[in-house]
Structures are given as C-alpha cells and as structure tokens.
C-alpha cells in the first residue's frame, strides 16, 4: 500500500535506467560463472589424474580411496558453483537497494482512498434489529479520534463501542433500539487508510428500525455570542416538541457535532417541524441540566426539505490551472444556513467559594455571585469592631477585608464567624453561618526573619561605603507607600493619569498635587480634577453602581480608604506638562507615605492622530455602541451610535483597527448575556468585515450595514482565533513527482 518499492510492482517503462543496469549486472555475473566453470573443469582433470595414480599403487583400498576424493571434489564443486551465485544475488540486492536510495521517485505513492465494499446490516437498510454494525473496506483502515469525531444519532446515553479492526469497523450500540427510528453513525472525516492516511471523506452510515429510512438534513453554524468566534465540538440537536421545557428535561432527538469552523450537519431527519439547540454537554445527558453549560437556542421553527439544484464543480489540472468547470445537479437540503449564538448564563445562585490570606494584611472571600448585602464577620479570637477596611469588587462577588491594626496583621491565625446570604436547594435566599480559620501564608516569624536579613544586608553595604570613604546612611530607610503612576511620555488628549495604590489610603492631600503646563518657555499652573477611578464594569449599570458605592463607602469617604484614582486635566495638543507631587501627599492605613514625585509628559499635536467615522444603517434607532478593536480582538475605545446613525473615534494613532457593534437593548453600555428560562437571547454583536487602516491627519469614513452580511461571514479572519482546520485531501505527491520527471501521472490504482 505505502510507497510501492518491489520490482514486481514497478512498470518497466518508468524505470529504463534501472533495467539496463540490472541487465549489465546479469551479463557480468554470466561471465564470472563461465570463468568459474573453466577453473572447475581444470581442477576436475587434476583430481581424476591423481585418482588414477592412487588406483595403481593401492589396489586393496581403491573403493575407499576413490570415494573420498570424489566426495571432496563434489563438495568443492558445490562451493565453487554456489559462491558466484551467492555473490550475484548479493550484488543484485545491493544494486536494487542503491537504486531505491539514490532514486527518490523509486515508486508511485498510494493515493487511492479506502472504499466501502459492504456492511452488515446493509447501509440504509430497513427493519433492522441488530445492535452490532460491521462496515467493510477494501484495505486496512483506521479511525482518528472516534470519541470526538464520530456521532451516533439518536444520541446514546451509554457510549457505543467504535473501533477499527483491520479492514472493517465494528460498532456496538449499548442503548436499546427505538422502534421506527432512523439511526445514523456520522464518521465525518475520521476514516483514513492505514498507511498513507488517504481520507475516505465525510462518511455517514445509516439504518432504520422501521420500514422506511429518513434522509433529510439540516445544517448551520454555531458562534460565540459575544465575539462571533466559531464554536468547535459542541452538540447541536433537534426537538420535535415545541415546549421550552423539553430542553431542560428530555434528551435531544437527533444530534450532530460542530467542526473547527463551527459548522454542523444533522442527518437522518424525518419530515416535520423542529426547534434547534446547541449544548456544551458537560454531563453527557443531552439536555440543559447544568447552569454552567454553554447553550444556544432558536425561537424559530424549521421544516427540513430538499430541492433539486445546480452547483459548479471546478476540475483542476494542477494547483494553479483550471481544467474544466461543470454544472452538476444535486439534492439541496434546506435549511442549511442556521446560525446559533452560544452563551453562558450568568450564575445567580450564590454560595461561598473559598477564602484567601496570601498577604498577612488582608483577607479575601470569594462568592459565586454578588449580593448587595455584604457578609458579616464576627471575630472569635479578636475584636472585629473597626478592625477592617472593606473593599468589594465591582460585581460584589469578591470582598477584601484590609486589617487596620498591625497587631492583627502580625497574628498568624484569625478565627472568625462568617454570616452571608446563599441560595438553598429550592432556589431561595437564606442566611448561612460558617466558622473559618484564616491562616497567613507568610507567618510572622518568617517575615521578621526576612526583615532582619534585609537590615543586615543594608548595614553591610553601608559599612563598605564608610570604609571606602564614600557617602553612607546611618538610619535604615523608611519604607515608602506602594504606588504605581501611569503617565506615559506621550499622553493622548482623551486619556487621564492613573494612580494605583497597593493598600487603601488613610489620607489624600490634594493641595500637595501640582500640574504645570508649558507655554513658550514659561510654566503655568494648569487646572485638574482628582477623583476615585470609575469602575468600567459598572458603567451604565445604575443598580450595581449604587450597591458598589453603598458598600465601598459604608465606613469611608470618597477619597480616603480607596486604592485607585485618576487625575483629569485640561489636556491641550502640542503642550508639555509637568506633574509634581510633594512628599506625604498620600498615606496608607499603616502610615506609609508617598515620596516626592516629578513626572514630565507631553500631549502630541493633532497632526499625529487620525479620526474614524462609521455611518451605520439598518439598526432602526435601537441603542447601540461600537467598540474599536486592536489586532488581538481587544477593545481599545468605545463610542455610542448617535441618533443620526454615526459613531466617531478621535485621536487614533497610526495602525490597523477592527470594529464590532453591540446592540445595547438595556442601554447599560456593555454586552449582556442571555437567560433561557425567560427566552432572553444574548445581546446581538456584529463585526465590520474589513480592517480599517488609520494614518495621521486622515479623516476616514466607513459605511456599515451590520445586518446585510450573514453573521457567520462577518468576523475578519485576521482576528478570528478559532481557525478552520485544514481539510483532509489526497496529498497529490504522484502529480508532483510526474511533473518533476516530465511524464503523465498514473491512473488511480485498482485495489
């Protein structure tokens, strides 16, 4: 099968050089045999002469004496004849081997895919009762990733056994067969021959337990709802029942699995009306039973049918030249353009997940879902009154408790009683109390040991400086506040300066913050506004924002006890600025203060930027916003779609950009997922199907009709992460070899 190398399988006309070489070798061997024969005859005459002489001398022992030399002569003759013959065979083998090694095209490759020659029960058989299927091929085959690529429909709750056995495939169904039902075993492209991996192609075996077999098909694509990425390996199924509860209680009727492009084909469908669903089936029961499972659903009803249609089939002479284009009749199964948008529901069940005390000065509590009523902590081995600075996350699902008192920070174990709201088995919110032991990952003894080592190293360093007569310090430096300042040298006019502190602040003195702008050669005071940084995850969500600020300000004011701030200035193009912060402008809850800081930066000229405007049509006044994306599909700017259908982006640096539009039905400025029990689809997302190249001083306008192009053809390939796998095809190595030799390629070999 593999690389045809045996001489019997080679065609003489393709190997004239090798045949001529072998003939020369045979002629040479014949000459050698003649010489050996002459030598043998001479030796025979010598032996016979010696024998006659011995007969005359010893008459009594003639028989014995004559037999011995005669047998010896026969042995010598055999050796003399076998030696050249063995040498000849060895030379032929060496030459044949050399011909193969030195000739990379020593034989044609097997490029014929395997063929199905039969099956029991017969393919498309009816009134079948057997649960074991055997499919026979004309050569040895293998199945690649059967657990991923082979799908049995109707779905099997107990996994069938599927294996390749030489020239056949054995399938054993474990579930009981349903009456009057069409069964399909979709192998997709999993079947190849054993040696060269020539693909059989998409192959589906089917049979019916009733008197007729169903042959209709439906096809489509599954995409991630929030970014239109193809979803690979998810189940897509049909329900003939229209009730929404079927997806929650009953396994799918017929199923398929999506490929790397997100495409699916459900085969063996009976005429009728259906609803289509997709499911990342975590527990293998073919229904939506876990809220963490990714799903997709369509509220539309489909009716599978088939029509006679025509399609173009292109025949290629080689990889570059078209040989012919033919019009071919085929049966077109519809619908074949279903698009499902997959999403994960927001987890609303609340329960305690875990605790952390990685740093000695804070405790983190993690919950599955946020709650506007924060947990209550009661200290069991300390007084919890005024012991914490409480910092909730944006979604209120992670609560950080900063320990105010250093005595508590230095305590390795804190025992607390935690009371919080959780969801019970009936879905009701109830109060739950747990006892927790909070252990510091960095024990006090280790921290003191590290501090002592740090001081010893510092003292040694100062001693060396003193010994060399250089300047040294006599007082161990006071630790400064943990602060990160984000102020790039070139600050875009629509950006601000960000401050991030490692620990909540106890004091902010804005009188020690100074911003200067340079006009000509002089520096002038420039106005600014210093405030806590708004959480982007809460943008537009008034309810979440209210809960966040209620929790965040329960024991602190708007500046103190926070960790993130921004400085907003009146940034003017082509102007230099200097930010100067006096020492002790900031102090954290442990008394650490900020040092003197001076940071210079410039706002570039408007000539360094371009602008981009989208004229958006077909959205009928629905609230929308556009996100400008980088080459990694990450949003870098956001702009609302105005009432006149435009979205504008200013201060764009030179580069390549992409864009997506989000239909913001609740007008909260962010994408929201769906909820199946309420029949709520995730918010729609559309991609501009081209990249936009921006240049300095350019004003670019693009017209965009988001609903005009099919959803599965919108996202540009350049930013699509789930790439389509290369389709399995014959490698065409014989064609390449024939082109290299300047001869016609062989016809397909009959197996």
Regions found by a protein language model. Name each.
Residues 3, 22-29, 33-37, 49-55, ...:
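N-terminal targeting or signal-anchor segments and their processing/structural boundaries
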Residues 7-8, 42, 68, 72, ...:
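N-terminal polybasic/positive-inside topogenic patches
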Residues 11-13, 24, 39, 45, ...:
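Polybasic, lysine-rich low-complexity intrinsically disordered segments
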Residues 15-18, 84:
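Intrinsic-disorder-associated interaction segments
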């Amino acid at each position: 099968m593999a690389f045809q190398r045996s001489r019997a399988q080679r065609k003489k006309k393709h190997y004239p050089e090798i045949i001529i070489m072998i003939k020369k070798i045979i002629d040479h061997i014949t000459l050698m045999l003649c010489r050996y024969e002459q030598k043998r005859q001479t030796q025979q005459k010598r032996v016979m002469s010696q024998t006659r002489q011995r007969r005359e001398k010893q008459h009594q022992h003639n028989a014995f004496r004559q037999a011995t030399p005669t047998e010896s002569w026969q042995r010598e003759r055999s050796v003399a004849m076998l030696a050249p013959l063995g040498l000849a065979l060895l030379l032929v083998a060496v030459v044949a081997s050399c011909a193969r090694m030195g000739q990379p095209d020593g034989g044609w490759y097997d490029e014929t895919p395997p063929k199905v020659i039969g099956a029991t029960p017969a393919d498309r058989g009816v009134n079948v009762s057997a649960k074991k299927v055997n499919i026979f091929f004309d050569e040895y085959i293998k199945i690649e990733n059967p657990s991923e690529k082979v799908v049995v429909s109707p779905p099997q709750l107990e996994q069938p056994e599927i294996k390749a056995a030489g020239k056949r495939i054995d399938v054993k169904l474990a579930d009981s067969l349903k009456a009057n039902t069409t069964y399909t075993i979709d192998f997709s492209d999993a079947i190849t021959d054993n040696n060269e991996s020539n693909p059989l192609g998409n192959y589906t075996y089917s049979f019916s337990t009733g008197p007729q077999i169903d042959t209709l098909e439906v096809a489509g694509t599954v995409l991630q709802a929030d970014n239109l990425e193809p979803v690979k390996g998810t189940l897509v199924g049909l329900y003939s029942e229209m009730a929404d509860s079927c997806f929650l209680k009953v396994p799918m009727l017929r199923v398929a699995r999506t490929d790397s492009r997100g495409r699916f084909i459900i085969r063996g469908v009976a005429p009728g009306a259906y609803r289509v669903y997709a499911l990342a089936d975590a527990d293998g029961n073919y229904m939506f039973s876990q809220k963490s499972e990714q799903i997709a659903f369509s509220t539309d009803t489909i009716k599978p049918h088939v029509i006679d249609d025509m399609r173009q089939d292109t025949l290629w002479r080689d990889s570059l030249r078209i040989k012919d284009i033919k019009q071919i009749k085929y049966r077109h199964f519809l619908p074949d353009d279903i698009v499902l948008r997959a999403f994960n529901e927001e987890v609303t069940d609340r329960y305690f997940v875990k605790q952390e005390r990685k740093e000695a000065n804070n405790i983190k509590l993690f919950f599955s879902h946020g709650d506007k009523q924060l947990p209550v902590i009661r200290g069991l081995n300390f007084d919890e009154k005024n012991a914490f600075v409480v910092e909730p996350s944006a979604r209120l699902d992670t609560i950080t408790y900063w320990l105010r008192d250093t005595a508590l920070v230095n305590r390795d174990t804190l025992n607390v009683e935690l009371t919080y709201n959780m969801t019970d088995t009936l879905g009701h919110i109830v109060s739950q109390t747990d006892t927790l032991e909070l252990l510091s990952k960095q024990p006090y003894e280790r921290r003191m040991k590290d501090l002592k080592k740090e001081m010893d190293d510092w003292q040694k360093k100062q001693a060396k400086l003193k010994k060399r007569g250089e300047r040294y310090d006599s007082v161990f430096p006071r630790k400064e506040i943990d602060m990160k300042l984000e102020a790039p040298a070139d600050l875009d006019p629509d950006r601000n300066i960000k401050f991030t502190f490692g620990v909540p602040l106890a004091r902010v003195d804005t009188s020690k913050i100074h911003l200067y702008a340079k006009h000509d050669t002089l520096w002038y005071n420039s106005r600014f506004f210093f405030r806590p940084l708004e959480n982007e995850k809460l943008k537009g969500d008034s309810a979440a924002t209210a809960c966040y600020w209620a929790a965040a300000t329960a024991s602190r004011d708007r500046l103190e006890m926070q960790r993130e701030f921004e400085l907003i200035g009146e940034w003017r193009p082509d102007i230099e600025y200097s930010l100067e912060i006096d020492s002790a402008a900031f102090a954290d809850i442990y008394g650490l203060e900020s040092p003197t800081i001076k940071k210079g930066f410039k706002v570039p000229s408007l000539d360094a930027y371009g602008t981009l405007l989208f004229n958006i049509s077909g959205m009928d006044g629905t609230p929308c916003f556009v996100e400008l994306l980088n080459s990694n599909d990450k949003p870098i700017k956001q702009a609302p779609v105005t009432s006149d259908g435009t979205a504008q982006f200013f201060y764009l640096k030179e580069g390549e950009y992409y864009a997506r539009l989000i239909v913001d039905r609740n007008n909260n400025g962010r994408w929201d997922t769906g909820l199946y029990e309420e029949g709520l689809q995730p918010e729609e997302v559309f991609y501009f199907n081209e990249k936009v190249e921006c240049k300095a001083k350019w004003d670019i306008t693009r017209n965009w009709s988001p609903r005009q192009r099919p959803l599965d053809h919108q996202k540009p390939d350049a930013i699509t992460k789930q790439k389509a796998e290369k389709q399995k095809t014959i490698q065409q190595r014989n064609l390449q070899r024939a082109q290299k030799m300047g001869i016609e390629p062989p016809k397909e070999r009959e197996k």
